[in-house]
Design a protein with these regions (language model features):
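N-terminal export leaders
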Residues: 4-8
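Short aromatic-glycine-enriched beta-strand elements
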Residues: 49-56
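Short nucleic-acid-contacting surface segments enriched for D/E, G, S/T with interspersed K/R
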Residues: 75-90
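OB-fold/S1-family single-stranded nucleic acid-binding modules
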Residues: 97-118
Length: 118
């Protein structure tokens, strides 16, 4: 028998799913006052959903730079080849409030082109 307690448990579990997705995909966790403006080679990268990711080294620390979803990257003209390891990019990004080595890119410059990611 489906009781009120079962209903409340199910409703609580289902309501947590959008919050978890928002925590990952929402940009409120990034501090627009803490900007990274860095030019350097890509150490490694992923070009896959939920979003592309660059890994770059600055002052001996590996930084994780989250990009837009691949559909947006493609629509804006940023290919997997553009962010391949060894490519030199300029990245303008905001620091994550909880992890100082994670950033969200606002834009990247590659081969003289600036690609806005928002």
């Amino acid at each position: 028998m489906f009781t009120r307690r079962h209903f409340l448990a199910a409703a609580g579990a289902l309501s947590a799913v959008p919050m978890a997705a928002q925590a990952h995909h929402g940009w409120g966790g990034f501090d627009r006052e803490k900007v990274l403006d860095h030019t350097g080679p890509v150490a490694r990268s992923t070009y896959a959903n939920p979003h592309g990711t660059l890994y770059m080294v600055k002052d001996g620390q590996e930084l994780t730079i989250e990009l837009a979803p691949t559909s947006r990257l493609q629509a804006r003209g940023l290919s997997a080849e553009d962010v391949a390891p060894g490519k030199t990019l300029r990245v303008y990004a905001y620091q994550n409030r909880g992890n100082p080595n994670v950033y969200r890119a606002e834009w990247v410059e590659v081969a003289g082109r600036r690609i806005e990611l928002r």
